[in-house]
Amino acid sequence: MLTYENPIIPGFYPDPSICRVGEDYYLVNSSFEFFPGVPLWHSRDLFHWEQIGHVLTRDSQLPLQNCNTSGGIYAPTIRFRDGRFYMITTNVSNGGNFFVWTDDIRGEWSEPVYIDQGGIDPSLFWDDDGTVYYTGTHSDENGLPGIGMFPVDLETGARLGETKIIWYGTGGKCPEGPHIYKINGWYYLMIAEGGTEYGHMETIARSRSVWGPYESCPHNPIVTHRNAHREVDFHAVGHADLVEAPDGKWWMVCHAIRPSVFMLHHTGRETMLLPVEWDENGWPVVNENKYITAEMQAEGEGDVRVQRSWRDDFTADAPAPRWAYLRNPDRSRYAFGGGLTLHGSADTLDDLGAPTFLAVRQQQFALRYETQMQLSGHADAAAGLTIFHTNEHHYELLARPAESGLAVQLRRRAVDMQTLSEPVVFENTGTLVLRIEAERMKYTFLAGPDASRLRVIGTGSTQLLSTECMNCTFTGCFAGMFAEGDCTAHFAYFSVEDAREA
């Protein structure tokens, strides 16, 4: 048997949607206030995934100015039809629902085509007669939420009919994330319910007509951990999409969370892979109705593990796809090649602007982040490493220029609680090695003139950066580099090591 690891895409990569073209699978995730938008992944076997870019790479496609925390890009759907890829999503901060398209999955995507429809979580379905249907969240005249549908013109984005609610779900709150599939003469409508927290679930219904009425699956929900005991590997399972492999087997991608301590999580909602079978009555059975586990088995041979350790020396003239900016970046403040140079600005990590910030998603609990930084500038400026979740929840290992060297401090913010440690001055140097050691329950921040002479500057609890300690956030923790104020910081490298191997 083949053993693979869940999550297949770890870290803040929620709301997965998938399609297959021949032997190739493509998957996208939501990205909220981070830029570029909608991470784009490729696989040949569903187990090994490579990020090949993003769908939304231009400011004109993705305006995020002054976007609130967990604003921006919500759940996307990716589909392929007649030689063309389509990605439809919602920018809840600027513009609403829209789709883009491309004929080259590794190339540029079109400008947005906006659709005059409220709600979130849009999806597209092509019927046998060529009619294209839009589905998404919608409320009826009494305010009851459900899934709305109407035919749409993909040339213009124009609605070709009125919105009709085709299913209200099974009674769980927040019916959302709809996808329609036509399988063996049935129209299957699969949705998420229960909210994206610990009551999350996936349900399905079917009809002989695309307009319904839809019959609910007798064993709904088809996926959930809402009743699971605390010790299971994952919670908040839902928001799924289905794909058929070339061999006729079916698979589901969905997201879930990994609690770090008790019922708190800080790495965000992560992408999972589950096998699907169809029972004698034509209903899907997901993962044999068992709980999702960190180690899964499938037909084949091998042991598939996600990459935990890597290093970036920033030799290219642009960041690799794994890197993210916060909102639309001022590109004049970033220089790549022979390391990374950041020029600070007036925007800080406390603001809803576009601070000088480049980071990657935290993908495991036990990791070691390290960089070598050279800093020059005004004494009030700061640069260094950050663990960032939102503008109100972040920790920084920062350095400031001092008369005789560099002064290092640990800055911690959790809503209105802010602390700044006493400065530790490293004499006669403008260069430091900075390290963050991540564990399940805490971060340890270290600095020194080189990697063999590091000094602990302080620690910070992961609990205060957990989603459950925040006011409505759908993202997860990032680790990376920043610069604030009048300064220039040069980073020779950024490395991530699997701390389990230490």
List each language-model region with its residue ranges:
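Carbohydrate-active catalytic/glycan-binding domains of CAZyme proteins
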Residues: 1-502
